[in-house]
Regions:
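Hydrophobic/aromatic-rich core segments of domains that either
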Residues: 107-170
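A broad, low-specificity signal for short, low-complexity segments enriched in glycine/proline
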Residues: 81-84, 102-108, 143
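A short, structured loop/turn motif at beta-sheet edges
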Residues: 5-9, 59-62, 114-117, 148-151
Length: 170
């Protein structure tokens, strides 16, 4: 029983996890309009619009445009966690500093995607390396999803940056 008398005590919780690869999946909501709207950390601005339009120029279809934005983000950003400001998912910070963690990579991508009318959103969970069958989870991990043709497409740009051999996998 949990109550104030045992507050502060350590507890151990175990889970059995069935890991599955997340692939493209159909939209249940059917209205991705909310994922085009700016917010405090992923705002609309002229810089995002300018960059995104340059990156997608000549690309036909949102799938090709999203891939171009992915490639641009992986080329521009570096997975480096130091200094002040990283890890907040601030797209302006990520655009200016060009470094950060998964949150920063994906906020930048989402800002660019939304600038060219591609709905995009964060997804968050845990990253468990495929080579490890048991043990602890080191913390949260996030990725982005973009919407086109009735489906959400998950992408993981920061993992693609950390492991260039997998950059085309994500």
């Amino acid at each position: 029983e949990f109550n104030s008398e045992n507050s502060g005590e350590n507890i151990e919780i175990g889970y059995l996890v069935n890991r599955q690869e997340k692939g493209v999946y159909e939209d249940i909501i059917k209205d991705p309009i909310d994922y085009l709207r700016p917010n405090r950390l992923v705002p609309e601005n002229e810089e995002f619009s300018k960059i995104a339009k340059e990156v997608v120029a000549g690309k036909l279809g949102q799938l090709a445009q999203a891939r171009a934005l992915y490639d641009h983000t992986i080329d521009r950003m570096k997975y480096i966690k130091y200094g002040d400001g990283w890890g907040k998912g601030d797209a302006v910070y990520a655009c200016d500093v060009k470094t950060g963690n998964c949150t920063d990579f994906h906020s930048y991508f989402i800002a660019l995607a939304r600038s060219v009318d591609i709905p995009a959103r964060f997804a968050i969970g845990a990253s468990i390396p495929s080579t490890r069958n048991e043990g602890g989870v080191d913390g949260y991990h996030c990725w982005a999803e973009f919407y086109t043709d009735g489906n959400w497409w998950p992408i993981d740009i920061s993992e693609g940056d950390k492991c260039s051999a997998l950059s085309t996998y994500y």
